[in-house]
Design a protein with these regions (language model features):
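Acidic/His- and Gly-rich active-site-bordering loop/insert found
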Residues: 2-108, 113, 117-132
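Non-cysteine beta-strand/loop elements that form the S-adenosyl-L-methionine
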Residues: 81-83, 92, 195, 354-359
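Active-site beta-loop-alpha junctions enriched in small/polar residues
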Residues: 35, 85-87, 143, 173, ...
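Metal-dependent amide/peptide-bond hydrolase catalytic core
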Residues: 2-5, 217-400
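Divalent metal-coordination and catalytic microenvironments
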Residues: 30, 69, 82, 112, ...
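A structural signal for isolated positions on well-ordered beta-strands in alpha/beta enzyme cores
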Residues: 59, 137-139, 297
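Histidine/acidic-residue-rich, glycine-tolerant segments that coordinate divalent metal ions
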Residues: 67-68, 89-107, 113-114, 126-257, ...
Length: 400
């Protein structure tokens, strides 16, 4: 480690680099024992046991398998929340290193093992130093990968039971150099929705199409027509995506089926655009189907709202990153990300910011959701240091 880097100007943050091996052990243990969303029993217990050993008050079962640690210091009523996700993905791991997944068909392919280890490292450090005045809530969230763990925690009274004045989360970014951060004010990640369009026609023999109403033909025209939604209804300076990803109809070569189904996904950076797309999907599907004598029913299901960083908290987080690694290593205008993230549910309740941390850009830095992915252990101290310094600055008592 280059000891001239800004992060080492703070002696007590240097300890996080000295504790890198411990965080690495936690991370690799979690990686070897991945658990899917709402099944994170071992992971939750590991987190709870570690927090308890640090002297942090532990609350289990928040949003099913979520864990919250509460650490108080001083007399201030101010509070801040720090969040990490814990779940793995249904992917068969291709790696062969010793800490590879021991559960066939399940792996940590998105770095949630690293996110959890970084927050544990920060929790241990803050519990030892008490270098703040107020309350820190360490939020370990289950089920980020598409099944609503953040929403479950919020609905379970997360912020009613553990009130936070501000909230921060972090995700690793493969392809971004180690020791770098990216922070964006305003919309950062798209909201996501799924849709199904069921087209009803009238079945017939394939040799006698005139005796039926072909739902496949209608579905094909619907798939084409809905591509006009973004190009003709979304302002060119905004961004949205409508993708048909499935078309299912029939199971015989010589039979025009009775029905067809189109399915797909929508991404947008505002709820207004998302709602508009949902309305137009139904309108276009019904109109096009009617033109062929068929009918169409649309089921539009928003999954995640857009992730929107609070401008003030984004500026604050960027300042913390710049203090740690230097302003030249903090990108404040990263591109919008079309992927979705359910931390957006929490940010809809509490002002805060979601930060990206570099996972390395060298050889082997493959993307997330890849069977060859592994979190870069060298990033652990950077993430832990970000959380620590953020708490110290946000809750006063900023010893350097």
């Amino acid at each position: 480690m280059n000891r001239s880097e800004p992060i080492l100007n703070s002696l007590h943050l240097t300890a996080l680099f000295e504790k890198q091996e411990e965080m690495r052990e936690w991370r690799r243990d979690i990686h070897a024992h991945p658990e899917l969303g709402f099944e994170e029993k071992r992971t939750s217990e590991l987190v709870a046991a570690r927090l308890d050993s640090f002297g942090i008050e532990v609350h289990r079962g928040i949003g099913k398998t979520g864990v919250v640690g509460v650490l108080k210091s001083g007399t201030s009523a101010s509070s801040v929340g720090l969040r990490a996700d814990m779940d793995a993905l249904p992917i068969h791991e291709a790696n062969t290193f010793p800490h590879r997944s021991r559960h066939d068909g399940v792996m940590h392919a998105c770095g949630h093992d690293g996110h959890t280890a970084m927050l544990l490292g920060a929790a241990k450090h803050l519990a030892r130093t008490r270098s703040f005045d107020g309350t820190v809530h360490f939020i370990f969230q289950p089920a980020e990968e598409g099944i609503g763990g953040a929403k479950a925690m919020v609905e379970d009274g997360l912020f009613r039971r553990f009130p936070c004045e501000s909230l921060f989360g972090m995700h690793n970014r493969p392809g971004m150099a180690l020791g770098r951060f990216a922070v964006r004010s305003g919309p950062m990640m798209a909201g996501g929705a799924f849709f199904d369009i069921d087209v009803a026609g009238r079945g017939a023999h394939g040799a006698r199409p005139e005796s039926g109403i072909d739902p496949v033909l209608a579905a094909a025209h619907i798939a084409t027509a809905i591509q006009s939604i973004v190009s003709r209804n979304v302002r060119p300076v905004e961004t949205a995506v409508v993708s048909v990803t499935q078309i299912h109809a029939g199971d015989a070569y010589n039979v025009i089926p009775q029905s067809a189904r189109l399915s797909g996904t929508v991404r947008a950076f505002s709820t207004e655009v998302m709602d508009m797309i949902g309305r137009n999907l139904a309108r276009i599907a019904e109109g096009v189907a009617a033109g062929f004598g068929a009918s169409a029913k649309t089921d539009f299901r928003p999954i995640f709202p857009p992730l929107v960083n609070d401008a003030r908290e984004a500026e604050f987080a960027a300042g913390v990153c710049a203090e740690l690694v230097g302003p030249d290593k903090v990108r404040r205008d990263p591109p919008l990300i079309m992927a979705s993230e359910d931390f957006s549910y929490m940010l809809a309740e509490v002002p805060g910011c979601y930060v990206n941390i570099g996972n390395g850009d060298g050889e082997g830095a493959c993307e997330v959701h890849n069977p060859g992915y592994d979190f870069n252990d060298a990033a652990l101290p950077y993430g832990a240091a970000f959380f620590v310094r953020l708490v110290e600055k946000k809750l006063g008592k900023t010893r350097a």
